[in-house]
Amino acid sequence: MRTSQYLLSTLKETPADAEVISHQLMLRAGMIRKLASGLYTWLPTGLRVLKKVENIVREEMNNAGAIEVSMPVVQPADLWQESGRWEQYGPELLRFVDRGERPFVLGPTHEEVITDLVRNELSSYKQLPLNFFQIQTKFRDEVRPRFGVMRSREFLMKDAYSFHTSQESLQETYDAMYAAYSRIFSRMGLDFRAVQADTGSIGGNASHEFQVLAQSGEDDIVFSDVSDYAANIELAEAIAPQTPRAAATQEMTLVDTPNAKTIAELVEQFNLPIEKTVKTLLVKAVKDSKSPLVALLVRGDHELNEVKAEKLPQVASPLTFATEEEIRAVINAGPGSLGPVNMPIPVIIDRTVAAMSDFAAGANIDGKHYFGINWDRDVATPVVADIRNVVAGDPSPDGQGTLLIKRGIEVGHIFQLGTKYSEALKASVQGEDGRNQILTMGCYGIGVTRVVAAAIEQNFDERGIVWPDAIAPFQVAILPMNMHKSFRVQELAEKLYSELRAQGIEVLMDDRKERPGVMFADMELIGIPHTIVIGDRNLDNDDIEYKYRRSGEKSLIKTGDIVDYLVKAIKG
C-alpha cells in the first residue's frame, strides 16, 4: 500500500473527549472516527487491525472444532419473552416494532436465537456435541458509552454456543474453548490472565473471564504470586485469619461520637487503628423473612463484596441497600451509628470480623459508639461468612503464596450455562435411552473490537502505538527520503516494495511529498513494527537504516540483505 493511495488521517493533537490512551491513539492514528455516542466508523488502518484480530479468532475456533454460522442482528421479541430475558435484561436491550407492530430487539447476545435453531434442527443425541460460532455486530444501548470502542454501543463480537447431552461432554468443550482462548490471546502478544468469574446475568455454572492486564481496566483481578490461581475480585475467597482471636483487654464503653458518622471520621477523631473498627451495612432481606433487613459487618478498612453478599440465603437478590428511612424504622438510629450490640435484626459478620477483639462499632444510638467490644462477652458471635473483597497480601485461596491485585480489561468470557436456556425454550433431543433429553449448553464470547483497544492499552509509548507483530496494520514501513528528487532512492524503494510484497509481507510505503519528520512521526504513531529508511547518504555506502519500533534500536543493513533480514525477522 502507498500512502498516496491510502487514507492515513493522522492527527497531531489529542481530541479533548478521549479519556483513555487507546481512545486517544485510535483517533490520532486514524483508526476510528466517531459517528454518534458509542458508534464508530472504522477507517482503513483500524479495520486492518480489526480484521487481523478477527482472523486469529476464526482460525483458532475452527481449529477447536467449532462451526461458523451467521445469525440475524434483529431478533423477534417472542424468543426473549420465551426465555424470560425480555423482562430481565433492562434498558440496554434496544426494543422496537416493525411496520406490522411486531416487537423486535437488536441482539446484544444470541442465546435465544441459537437455541431456537438447535431445537428445530437437531433431534438425536447422535448429532451431538456441536459448537456453533459467529463473528458479528452486536448492539447494547449503554447508558454512558465511554473509552471509545472499549465500551461502545455497537461492537464486533465472537460468540459461540455449544450443545451437549451430559455435563462431561460440556466440560470437554469448555476445556477446549479455554485452551483456544489462551492460544488466541497468546498469538496476539497480549499479557492476560484467565480468572474465575461470576456468571452474572447470563446465568449458569462455571465461568472464566480472560482479562488483559492494563491500568485503565475497569475490573480488579487477583492472582497468586506463586501459583496459577486467578479470579475476578468478585469471586476471590477471603481466607479466614489463621491466628486465634486475641483475648479481651478492654471493657466495653459507650462513647459520645456526635461528629463521627463515617469510619474515617471515627478513626481520625479518636485516634483508633482502622483495623480495630467495624462498619455495619444494612440490606434488604429475602421475602417472608421475619425481619425486613439484614446487617452485614466488615472490618473498617475492608469493602463489602456485593456479589458474595447477594448469594447469602438471608439476603434479597438483587442486593439492595436500605435507605436511611428504612434503617430508622427498624433500628431507630442513622446509618453512621450502627453496630452488632443490641442489633434487633439478623447479623452476618465477615470472617475477619469474627477474629477481632477490643473493636469499635456503632451503638445503634445516634451519635454514640461502643469501644472495646468483644464477641461472646458483649454480644454473641452471629453467623460468619466470607463477605468482603480480598486485599493485596491476603493468603491465596489455594494455599500457595499471597494475592496480588491488578486492573484488567475483560476481552473474553466463557460460561457453562447448563440448561437455563434449553429448558426455557424446550430444546431437547432423543437420548440414548429413547427419552427426550433437555440439552446442556455452554457459551463463549470474545469482544473483538475491545481486543484492539486492550492491545493498545498494553502497547504504547510517548510516540504512539507499539503493535504486537501479529495484529499490526502493516508489518513494514518504507520511508524513502526525498524520493521525488532522488532517482536512486525512488528506484530502490520501488524495488524493495515489490520484493517484500512478493514475499507476502504487508508494506506501507510513504511516497508523500512530506518532510521526513512528518513521515517518521506518522509511522511511529500508527505503530508499524519494522521501518526501513532509504536515503542518499546511507546509499553512498550501500546501506539502509532499519528500526524496530518496540525497542527503538537502529542498525545499518546492506541493501542486498534487507529483504532476507525482514523476512527472517517477521516470519522467523
Curated annotation (Swiss-Prot):
One of its GO terms (molecular function) is proline-tRNA ligase activity. It comes from Salmonella newport (strain SL254). NCBIfam families: PRK09194.1, proS_fam_II. This is Proline--tRNA ligase. It catalyses: tRNA(Pro) + L-proline + ATP = L-prolyl-tRNA(Pro) + AMP + diphosphate. Consists of three domains: the N-terminal catalytic domain, the editing domain and the C-terminal anticodon-binding domain. One of its GO terms (biological process) is prolyl-tRNA aminoacylation. GO terms for cellular component: cytosol. Its EC number is 6.1.1.15. Homodimer. InterPro entries: aa-tRNA-synt_IIb (IPR002314), aa-tRNA-synth_II (IPR006195), aa-tRNA-synth_II/BPL/LPL (IPR045864), Anticodon-bd (IPR004154), Anticodon-bd_dom_sf (IPR036621), Pro-tRNA-ligase_IIa (IPR002316), Pro-tRNA-synth_IIa_bac-type (IPR004500), Pro-tRNA-Synthase_IIa_type1 (IPR023717). PROSITE patterns: AA_TRNA_LIGASE_II (PS50862). Gene3D superfamilies: Anticodon-binding domain (3.40.50.800), Bira Bifunctional Protein, Domain 2 (3.30.930.10), YbaK/aminoacyl-tRNA synthetase-associated domain (3.90.960.10). SUPFAM superfamilies: Class II aaRS ABD-related, Class II aaRS and biotin synthetases, YbaK/ProRS associated domain. Signal peptide: none annotated. It is found in: Cytoplasm.
